[in-house]
Amino acid sequence: MVEINGVPVEDTFCEAFKGLYARFIVTAADERPLREAAENVAALPATVFGESEAGVERWLDPEETPDGRPGFVAQMWVEYGDDAVKKLEHELGKRIRQGVLVRPTTRVFDACEDPDGYIDTERPIGRCADGYEYTDVRFDREMVHVPIMMGEFLIERRLGYAEGVAGGLVWLFCEDVDAALEAGYRAVEALRDVEGVITPFNVCAAGSKPETIYPDIGPTTNHPYCPTLRDRILDSKVPEGVEAIPEIVINGVSLDVVKRAIGIAIEAATEVDGVVKVSAGNFGGKLGDYRIPLRECIRE
């Protein structure tokens, strides 16, 4: 078994899935609405319910944005399938209208590199101006203007989308919750420097499984890995001395960038005292579009 920073990394793999994502920049005149917009965009990962999930990729200085204001890069994802583009358009409308447009001074710009296609934002977002929307060229881009009660909300007319890789993950077996929090957030922060990835759950406390006695509600708790059930069930897979197992889920624009991100997350997390093992969840190779062995993610 390979060790990183003295912590064993189990010889296993995670499964990841094809997804469709939009990548865009949000800017604002003030840090307060910008932070609120980021929280709104990234809130409530809900692809398991047929909706969307999103996250902040990185923060931008004014010189890095089209309009010279502070901002952030975000990704929003839906499951891949025949109706994925239609679903992505609908979900973008929800998250941007209710999460960004309502925050004062915000603007949205396309940031998708090498897109497979474009969504015309005039329909799902611009038309909430109820006929008062209009387009012109600002910042060398075609922008849709939406008059609002604090001025105008601007969004680029075309937002690109592309196929990516969603659901790569790593598990951190920790001695206690304090170690799990420190290791988990250390991993998430390390990924802020990796272009093209997000962690839609940040530090996830509740990994799930597809098998359930309540199929009407969707995925449920991954009970073999719940430390409080270790002495109550026969199929517990929680070792003695482990009291918390945070999960770091990673979506990225390519398989290579997801693998690189998993390796960086492992390196960062294993620097924390109290991490006793690194592993990953999978479905026996039966569900995912990709199998990602952890050993292939670790940098030599």
From Swiss-Prot:
**Transmembrane residue ranges:** none
**Keywords, alphabetical:** Transferase
Which Gene Ontology terms describe the biological processes this protein takes part in?
one-carbon metabolic process
Does this entry carry the keyword ATP-binding? Answer: no
NCBIfam families reported for this sequence: PRK02114.1
A GO molecular-function term, please?
formylmethanofuran-tetrahydromethanopterin N-formyltransferase activity
Any keyword Translocase? no
One Pfam entry name: FTR_C
Family membership noted in the UniProt record? Belongs to the FTR family.
InterPro entries on file: ForMFR_H4MPT_ForTrfase, ForMFR_H4MPT_ForTrfase_C, ForMFR_H4MPT_ForTrfase_fd-like, ForMFR_H4MPT_ForTrfase_N
Species this chain originates from = Methanopyrus kandleri (strain AV19 / DSM 6324 / JCM 9639 / NBRC 100938)
Instruction: Give the protein name, as stated in the record.
Output: Formylmethanofuran--tetrahydromethanopterin formyltransferase-like protein
